């Protein structure tokens, strides 16, 4: 497992595809981009098409799938997502890019069989993850009791993670400098996994650095 800057994503993709060309395998290389949520948000849509166009210039095709993990109600629905991908892509993609840890938690079993040894890049990776699929689907706030180090989910796989720092303390500090008499801070978010985790980051930053 490697932890690297988001800026070298394309170098990593090229690096994972190079061995295929070196072995003289089929030139029909395909990168599959799986979004833990969907591609409706402008940044996600822009991200995919940027990847798509950059790869297309190199003769590599790219496809996208939305996993809609926040909408999954139970393990049966999660298994249905995995079964859909297994049927739709019986021939393993050359590489997989996963936007967000939740998608990896739901789909990692694909890399035990039909997609075994396929290199995967997980963006927006966190240090601690839900201890089980059930914890993820419950939307429960993560604690020491119901979470594990991310390495527990990633060990043994051909996986590279890209971490995203959210600068909670730095953002609050900037606001505090602009509004020195600020007494309350409102953080507006939704019920997605990453939003819950970011709320925790903001809460911790306030309690640790701005106790007053």
Each language-model region and where it sits:
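Bacterial N-terminal signal peptides
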Residues: 6-16
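Short hydrophobic alpha-helices and adjacent helix-cap/hinge residues
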Residues: 4, 17-212
């Amino acid at each position: 497992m490697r932890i690297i800057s988001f800026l070298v994503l394309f170098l990593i993709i090229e690096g994972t595809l190079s061995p295929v060309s070196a072995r003289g395998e089929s030139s029909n290389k395909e990168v599959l981009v799986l979004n833990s949520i969907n591609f409706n948000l402008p940044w996600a849509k822009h991200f995919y098409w940027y990847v798509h166009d950059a790869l297309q210039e190199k003769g590599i095709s790219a496809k996208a799938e939305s996993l809609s993990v926040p909408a999954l109600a139970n393990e049966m629905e999660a298994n249905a997502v995995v079964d859909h991908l297994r049927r739709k892509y019986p021939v393993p993609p050359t590489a997989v890019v996963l936007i967000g840890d939740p998608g990896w938690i739901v789909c990692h079993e694909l890399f035990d069989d039909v997609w075994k040894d396929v290199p995967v890049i997980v963006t927006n990776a966190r240090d601690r993850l839900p201890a089980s699929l059930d914890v993820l689907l419950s939307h429960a706030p993560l604690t020491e009791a119901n979470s594990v180090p991310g390495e527990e989910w990633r060990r043994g796989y051909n996986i590279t993670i890209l971490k995203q720092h959210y600068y909670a303390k730095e953002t609050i500090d900037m606001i505090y400098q602009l509004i020195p008499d600020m007494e309350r801070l409102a953080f507006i978010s939704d019920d997605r996994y990453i939003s819950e985790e970011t709320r925790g980051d903001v809460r911790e930053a306030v309690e640790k650095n701005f106790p007053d």
